[in-house]
A protein has these predicted regions:
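Sequence-structural signature of mature extracellular/luminal beta-sheet repeat domains
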Residues: 1-158
Length: 158
């Protein structure tokens, strides 16, 4: 993981991560990232150290943290959003809906009410991507199903 300073200098913040994706900052002062073999890393930027503290067994894509520093991880191959506690305990938070299960959850973001929005990439080069809303506790619904080609990221405004 690196930092670009002044558009000309790159500083390595931490080394040794496996294809980090979905980097997120926690209120606890750590950065978090996932790896392509399901690794979930906690990163101490000040010390330049990381530790793998959880594993989903899939490919960690986007992630978001709640106010309690639980990490919600989009795992493409497992077609699941996992909830990861700071202890490293991994549990299934959502697999989509009964009628429309996840095919490839890609990125997650919280709103101020604690709803987790997840972009579902759909099929490669297809226009069947959509956005799900997962309410606190895990109840999941399709929030937006307008034809979208491979959504890969989202941002929630006030």
């Amino acid at each position: 993981m690196a930092l670009l300073n002044n558009d000309t200098q790159v500083s390595v913040l931490v080394d040794g991560l496996d294809h980090p994706e979905g980097i997120a900052w926690g209120l606890d002062g750590y950065a978090y990232a996932g790896g392509e073999a399901g690794q979930v890393y906690r990163i101490d930027i000040d010390r330049g150290e990381m530790v793998q503290f959880a594993d989903t067994g899939g490919f960690v894509l986007g992630m978001a943290l709640d106010a309690q520093s639980n990490i919600y991880v989009c795992d493409g191959p497992n077609k699941t959003v996992f909830k990861i506690a700071q202890s490293g305990a991994v549990s299934t938070y959502s697999t989509g809906t009964a009628d429309e299960p996840f095919r490839g959850p890609n990125y997650a973001a919280f709103d101020v009410k604690g709803n987790l929005y997840v972009c579902e990439s759909g099929d490669w080069h297809g226009d069947n991507g959509m956005i799900y809303r997962i309410k606190p506790g895990g109840e999941t619904e399709v929030w937006d199903r307008r034809p979208t080609t491979f959504p890969n990221g989202l941002c929630i405004g006030p």
